């Protein structure tokens, strides 16, 4: 992007104000990958609320400012100069990250770095031992190759996941129109939209995309769709008048990339390319760097623990080796062997596969995860900042209430009309239905007779679409009904009159009268009426009926609904005979003295599943905050209807109204709910915003700009929350990128929102987030179990080296054997724990505290290493010494035997019975010991995976066979063990030997001990919550 500080950028707010530099004052949270100070400063500057006044200037002032003409446009020569100065009217993409850098990042995560270090150590050890002719030389080489292979394979998988998502800026390019109609030197012609410059005079019509930020000079019946930019679900009227000090609120500015729905417009280009609102959002979205995910932080924390312990143990035994007489090189080999033995080689694959399985499970429930780590992040979420339009609501206007015969009725918009609350034979209803059907320009797209009415495609704006569908549901065949009342003339809706009028002939050929019907802003329609239709009778519109109208109007408006008024007038055949030439310019027909028929209110209704989803979030301790660009009254009404503002909760304004006191006399802390609009947010300093978020549990932000959404997310993060942001519009993309996890809508979502997000809801259903939260929490619990299972065997893999060094026994366990444990036999049970059901209703627990509830905590490490791991070590050594003794090598003889055992030249070493062993025989016996120790670990690990099914409940309560994948994994583990032991050729390939059956039985008592020991631990945890036992032994 160019130098943004040289451009005149703007947002909802005007002027610096007390909070104008809010974003710049706020301290930045540390981001993944960091960034230069200048880049951060530039991003902060972009987030400031900046000022323009083009919408407030007169036409003459605009002509002077941009050296243009409001009738002839720019001169061709000046346009060429401006294009050369400002560049094309296009979004300039940021410098992309090279693909090799993306791939390198996948190879350089926390666990990956640890494994690279381990592989390097193995290669160094290989080089040292090769120079000494050591028999374990090849083992270290194989181990290094295996470690590198694991890192590369998992890195390729991660890179593939990232490769599937596209660059954010590319999605904004999809919004750029290709052609624009421009007037230069008085000539009208079409050019590529990227050739537009400031000061160009352009024309648009319904169906065109706005080619730049336009100051409107003339408009007729123009409406634009700003929903993807501001979040407003209603089509917005555009006219030449300045109606608001804010450029996003005024009617005389149309924004780059929004859609012109109907009417015609002529205007001046005031901003192009990166200087437009959409350009600024693109800069914000691409400038915001991703936060580290909680799972990435947890893995870093875990790597720190593992690396620290590995170095501690390695250094300790390096010193011991030096003290007992080993050479420096030999002691260094021991140090490296211990460090490598401490690295859980299979953990990286386990975490990747577990997250992938959960992502696949979520995909089957309409949640597509772009970033694997986002799976767990959603489970950690404590705050959801949700957009309203299209996320909480259906993004389609629907008739909600009707007022006629002095009663408010709830509209039934279902196909069977079984819930209709009024008499459809009422004469007043028939008249109202006739008016709303005839005074309507919307039409169904042809060929949809078999499609349910709510799902039919309609050509027309949102309000008229809602009225047409309601008419179709209540009348049936609304289009045919219109045909029976042919339209004679029409005045389209415009912002000056605020009404739409049409005149029709009657369906009865014997009745020569005309019917005039009108709809529009209720107060404007009512002022043109002199009578009101009540129970089919026209009554004078006296003060009593005006008060009844006002009461109903305020009641419907207070629900956040859009209200329209309807009226009619029969034109007598004497003054307006058949064939009369109605003239809309001369208005040769009456437009007052009409008969008021009723009111119809519409709203973009909440999705049916949202209230239950919000309630589940509340139960799970997750706070749902609405952040929308829509009107505060509408936002509050929707928030109340879906449960974001709970029943009985009051805002400061509600309390003031109830107590009949001014708002400033109410203690704000007494209000549980709070609705803040964009202008108020602009005047708040950072501490006030944080205090508001802390004080009011139920928050709604309305009329917010994309910059403000970003600031709201940062403020929540500053309070220590893990923030999820949902949205579907272009305006949501910066906040989606900034959030700990961004969730975009798959159907209604813009490409920009989808590319900025970490997760996409294919069904656009907010309720799917609850499923994601549940799966995220479950995978955290199950990852904890998988890691505990994976770490336990580190001790029985490590202790053979410790005994080998300190007691000088023949090596009980080889590197290749460890590799088979880590990457072959144990990987399947470890992954199978990802399929374990939740122990309790995890959606009734509060979100985990990232600082306190760690993936790997002290109780988990202590229990896995020093309790279960110690038992497994005893099992391994028991089996090892049993196998050695049965072959003639009693335990006491084994002590101090290492040097002689490994002597290549000694071919007559005697055992406890006096039998002589050659080096080759001793080597095969060592392979037998490797296999015996391997089998001991595997038998104990079967017990270990069974106890890891639960952390608190008894395994009997959870059930042994509910997780069928785990049962299959155990069977597979045993089969692999048998294959490695008894397959011919294994001694020469992987150092495995056939072993006696009784050596399989030696570790069984230890497996039973592990199971019983853990059941006692769980019983204590359940019986003594909060006790020392619970705190130290519950992980």
UniProtKB/Swiss-Prot annotation:
Task: Indicate the transmembrane segments per the record.
Answer: 99-119, 143-163, 300-319, 332-349, 784-803, 814-834, 855-877, 930-949, 964-982, 998-1018
- GO molecular function terms listed in the Swiss-Prot or TrEMBL record: ATP binding; ATP hydrolysis activity; magnesium ion binding; P-type potassium:proton transporter activity; P-type sodium:potassium-exchanging transporter activity; potassium ion binding
Stored CDD domains = P-type_ATPase_Na-K_like
GO BP terms: namely: intracellular potassium ion homeostasis; intracellular sodium ion homeostasis; monoatomic ion transmembrane transport; pH reduction; potassium ion import across plasma membrane; potassium ion transmembrane transport; proton transmembrane transport; regulation of proton transport
Which reaction is this enzyme known to catalyze? K(+)(out) + ATP + H2O + H(+)(in) = K(+)(in) + ADP + phosphate + 2 H(+)(out)
Q: Which residues carry this modification: Phosphotyrosine?
A: 7, 10
Specify whether Phosphoprotein is a keyword of the entry: yes
Entry EC number(s): 7.2.2.19
Topology: which residues are Lumenal? Answer: 120-142, 320-331, 804-813, 878-929, 983-997
Q: List the membrane topology term(s).
A: Multi-pass membrane protein
| Keywords in alphabetical order | ATP-binding, Cell membrane, Hydrogen ion transport, Ion transport, Magnesium, Membrane, Metal-binding, Nucleotide-binding, Phosphoprotein, Potassium, Potassium transport, Translocase, Transmembrane, Transmembrane helix, Transport
Designated name of the protein: Potassium-transporting ATPase alpha chain 1
């Amino acid at each position: 992007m160019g130098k943004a500080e040289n451009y005149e950028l703007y947002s909802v707010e005007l002027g610096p104000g007390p909070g104008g530099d809010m974003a710049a004052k706020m301290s930045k949270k540390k981001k993944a990958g960091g960034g230069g100070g200048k880049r951060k400063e530039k991003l902060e500057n972009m987030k400031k609320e900046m000022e323009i006044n083009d919408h407030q200037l007169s036409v003459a002032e605009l002509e002077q400012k941009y050296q243009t003409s409001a009738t002839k446009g720019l001169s061709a020569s000046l346009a060429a100069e401006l294009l050369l100065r400002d560049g094309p009217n296009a979004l300039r993409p940021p410098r992309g990250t090279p693909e090799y850098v993306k791939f390198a990042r996948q190879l350089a995560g926390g666990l990956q770095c640890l494994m690279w270090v381990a592989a390097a150590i193995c290669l160094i050890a290989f080089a040292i031992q090769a120079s000494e002719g050591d028999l374990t030389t090849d083992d270290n080489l194989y181990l290094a190759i295996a470690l590198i292979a694991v890192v590369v394979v998992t890195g390729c998988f991660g890179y593939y996941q990232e490769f599937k998502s596209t660059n954010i800026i590319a999605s904004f390019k999809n919004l750029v129109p290709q052609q624009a109609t421009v007037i230069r030197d008085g000539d009208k012609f079409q050019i590529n939209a990227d050739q537009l410059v400031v000061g160009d005079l352009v024309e648009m019509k319904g169906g065109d995309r706005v080619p730049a930020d336009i100051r409107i000079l003339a408009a007729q019946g123009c409406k634009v769709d700003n929903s993807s930019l501001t979040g407003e679900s209603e089509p917005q009227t555009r006219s030449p008048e300045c109606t608001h000090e804010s450029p996003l609120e005024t009617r005389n500015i149309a924004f780059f990339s929004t859609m012109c729905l109907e009417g015609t417009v002529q205007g001046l280009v005031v901003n192009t390319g990166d200087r437009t609102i959409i350009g600024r959002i693109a800069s914000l979205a691409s400038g915001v760097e991703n936060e580290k995910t909680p799972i990435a932080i947890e893995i870093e924390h875990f790597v720190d623990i593992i690396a620290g312990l590995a170095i501690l143990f390695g250094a300790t035994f390096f010193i011991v080796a030096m003290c007992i007489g080993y050479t420096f090189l030999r002691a260094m080999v021991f140090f490296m062997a211990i460090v490598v033995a401490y690295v859980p080689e299979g953990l990286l694959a386990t975490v990747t596969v577990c997250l992938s399985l959960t992502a696949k499970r979520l995909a089957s429930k309409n949640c597509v995860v772009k970033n694997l780590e986002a799976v767990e992040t959603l489970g950690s979420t404590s705050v959801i900042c949700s957009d309203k339009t299209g996320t909480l609501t259906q993004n389609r206007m629907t008739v909600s209430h009707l007022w006629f015969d002095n009663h408010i009725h709830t509209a039934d918009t279902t196909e069977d009309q079984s819930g209709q609350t009024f008499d459809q034979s009422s004469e007043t209803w028939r008249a109202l239905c006739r008016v709303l059907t005839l005074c309507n320009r919307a039409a169904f797209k042809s060929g949809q007779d078999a499609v349910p009415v709510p799902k039919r495609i309609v050509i027309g704006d949102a309000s008229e679409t809602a009225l047409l569908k309601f008419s179709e549901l209540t009348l049936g065949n609304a289009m045919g009904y219109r045909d029976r009342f042919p339209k004679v003339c029409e005045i389209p809706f415009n912002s000056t009159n605020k009404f739409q009028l049409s005149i029709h002939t009657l369906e009865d050929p014997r009745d020569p009268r005309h019917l005039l019907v009108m709809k529009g802003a209720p107060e404007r329609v009512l002022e043109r009426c002199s009578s009101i239709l009540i129970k089919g009778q026209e009554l004078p519109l006296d003060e009593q009926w005006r008060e009844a109208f006002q009461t109903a109007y305020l009641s419907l408006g207070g629900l956040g609904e859009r209200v329209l008024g309807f009226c009619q007038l029969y034109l007598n055949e004497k003054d307006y005979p058949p064939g009369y030439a109605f003239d809309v310019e001369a208005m040769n027909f009456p437009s007052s003295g009409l008969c008021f028929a009723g009111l119809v209110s519409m709203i973009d209704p909440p999705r049916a599943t949202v209230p239950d989803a919000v309630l589940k979030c509340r139960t799970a301790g997750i706070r749902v905050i609405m952040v929308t660009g829509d009107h505060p009254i509408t936002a509050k009404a929707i928030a109340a209807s879906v449960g974001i503002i709970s029943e009985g909760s009051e805002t400061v304004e509600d309390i003031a109204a109830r107590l009949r006191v001014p708002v400033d006399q109410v203690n704000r802390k007494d209000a549980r709910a709070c609705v803040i609009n964009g202008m108020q947010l602009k005047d708040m300093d950072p501490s006030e915003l944080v205090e508001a978020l802390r004080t009011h549990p139920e928050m709604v932000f309305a009329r917010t700009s994309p910059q403000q959404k970003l600031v709201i997310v940062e403020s929540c993060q500053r309070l220590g929350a893990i923030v999820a942001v949902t949205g579907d519009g272009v305006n949501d993309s910066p906040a989606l990128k900034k959030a700990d996890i961004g969730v975009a809508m798959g159907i209604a979502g813009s490409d920009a929102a989808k590319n900025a997000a970490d997760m996409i809801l294919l069904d656009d259903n907010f309720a799917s987030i609850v499923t994601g939260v549940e799966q995220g929490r479950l995978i955290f619990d199950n990852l904890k179990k998988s890691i505990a299972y994976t770490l336990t065997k580190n001790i029985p893999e490590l202790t053979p080296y410790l005994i080998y060094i300190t007691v000088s026994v023949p090596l009980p366990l080889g590197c290749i054997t460890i590799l088979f444990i880590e990457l072959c036999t144990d990987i399947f049970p470890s992954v199978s724990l990802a399929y374990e059901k939740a122990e309790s209703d995890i959606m009734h627990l509060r979100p985990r505290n990232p600082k306190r509830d760690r993936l790997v905590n002290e109780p988990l490490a202590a229990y896995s290493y020093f309790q279960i791991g110690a038992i497994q070590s005893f099992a391994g050594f028991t089996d090892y010494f049993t196998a050695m003794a049965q072959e003639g090598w009693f335990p006491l003889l084994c002590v101090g035997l290492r040097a002689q055992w490994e002597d290549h030249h000694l071919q007559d070493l005697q055992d406890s019975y006096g039998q002589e062993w050659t080096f080759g025989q001793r080597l095969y016996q060592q392979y037998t010991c490797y296999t015996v120790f391997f089998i001991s670990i595997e038998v104990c690990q079967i017990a270990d995976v069974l106890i890891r099914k639960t952390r608190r409940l008894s395994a009997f309560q959870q059930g042994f066979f509910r997780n069928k994948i785990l049962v299959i994994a155990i069977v597979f583990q045993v089969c692999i063990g048998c294959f490695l032991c008894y397959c011919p050729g294994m001694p020469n390939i992987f150092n495995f030997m056939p072993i006696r059956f009784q050596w399989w039985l030696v570790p069984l008592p230890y497996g039973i001990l592990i199971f019983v020991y853990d059941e006692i631990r769980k019983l204590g945890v359940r019986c003594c919550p909060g006790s020392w036992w619970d705190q130290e032994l519950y992980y």
